[in-house]
From Swiss-Prot:
The keyword Cytoplasm applies. It comes from Thermotoga maritima (strain ATCC 43589 / DSM 3109 / JCM 10099 / NBRC 100826 / MSB8). The lineage of its organism: Bacteria, Thermotogati, Thermotogota, Thermotogae, Thermotogales. One of its GO terms (cellular component) is cytosol. It comes from the Bacteria. This is 4-hydroxy-tetrahydrodipicolinate synthase. The gene is dapA.
Length: 294
């Protein structure tokens, strides 16, 4: 589907409503700086608080702006298989290139339940499906063996966003899924694990940091793929303070504050999320200045 950087883009709000004008500026900023895909309505896009009509508006506008230049992948995960399928079919109807389907959360399915969840959805859509493993939020972990089983059996499941920070799991997930199917893709779901995942044989990152620093995140991956390991490592090291600062509070609270400081969006979230503290805003201001982004 893509190699490199897919930006998990924020959803701007203004006075409680979608701010499509600011959103267009942000999408164009991503395109101008060479990102390889956009992921709409993921965790960073505050998908739990965006209603069905707003989803349609946001996805449609994204597809209009992008105009086929890069893939548009839509977040479509819930903890109900049938509700998830409904969101997948909406994305399919709107013309998305793929869907990001988070593991069912709260109800804590077994590994067999996870497999059957993705099997059920994959049999009912032609879209490429990306498994999203983020156990820190969901309470359930896709084991490498399960990811490999999915890769082997479900041909329109194109890859996994691996947001388990454990480096042993990253290694095993990349190794076992690539053995199961050579074209199965593994993206880091944690910006600070991107360089490591690339070294393990992965394919890039679905990134929060690239909302703010798309050029630098693209460079990190591009240099690695070009064989310039030390240059890629250097870019990673320079980005570390920003990677750390953007997660001092729950994502997407800090990244929205950073984009507000940069003049892209209002610093507005929907409850139960609230804007960043003054301490966090000051930290972000300093890090953005040091990074040459302010």
């Amino acid at each position: 589907m893509f190699r490199g950087v897919g930006t998990a883009i924020v959803t701007p709000f203004k006075n409680g409503e979608l701010d499509l004008e600011s959103y267009e500026r942000l999408v164009r900023y991503q395109l101008e700086n060479g990102v390889n895909a956009l992921i709409v309505l993921g965790t960073t896009g505050e998908s739990p608080t965006v209603n069905e009509d707003e989803r349609e508006k946001l996805v449609s506008r994204t597809l209009e702006i992008v105009d086929g230049k890069i893939p548009v992948i839509v977040g479509a995960g819930t903890n109900s298989t049938e509700k998830t399928l409904k969101l997948v079919k909406q994305a399919e109807k709107l013309g998305a290139n793929g869907v990001l389907v988070v593991t069912p959360y709260y109800n804590k399915p077994t590994q067999e339940g996870l497999y059957q969840h993705y099997k059920y959805i994959s049999e009912r859509t032609d879209l490429g499906i990306v498994v999203y493993n983020v156990p820190g939020r969901t309470g359930v972990n896709v084991l490498p063996e399960t990811a490999a089983r999915i890769a082997a059996d479900l041909k329109n499941v194109v890859g996994i966003k691996e947001a388990n920070p454990d480096i042993d799991q990253i290694d095993r997930t990349v190794s076992l899924t690539k053995q199961a199917r050579s074209d199965f893709m593994v993206w880091s779901g944690n910006d600070d694990r991107t360089f490591y995942l690339l070294c393990a044989g992965g394919d890039g990152v679905i990134s929060v940091v690239s909302n703010v620093a798309p050029k630098q995140m693209v460079e990190l991956c591009a240099e690695y793929f070009s064989g310039n390991l030390e240059k890629s490592r250097e870019v990673h090291r320079k980005l570390r303070p920003l990677m750390k600062a953007l997660f001092v509070e729950t994502n997407p609270i800090p990244v929205k504050a950073a984009l507000n400081l940069m003049g892209f969006i209002e610093n507005e979230l929907r409850l139960p999320l609230v804007p960043a503290s003054e301490k966090t805003v000051e930290l972000l201001r300093n890090v953005l200045k040091e990074s040459g982004l302010l």
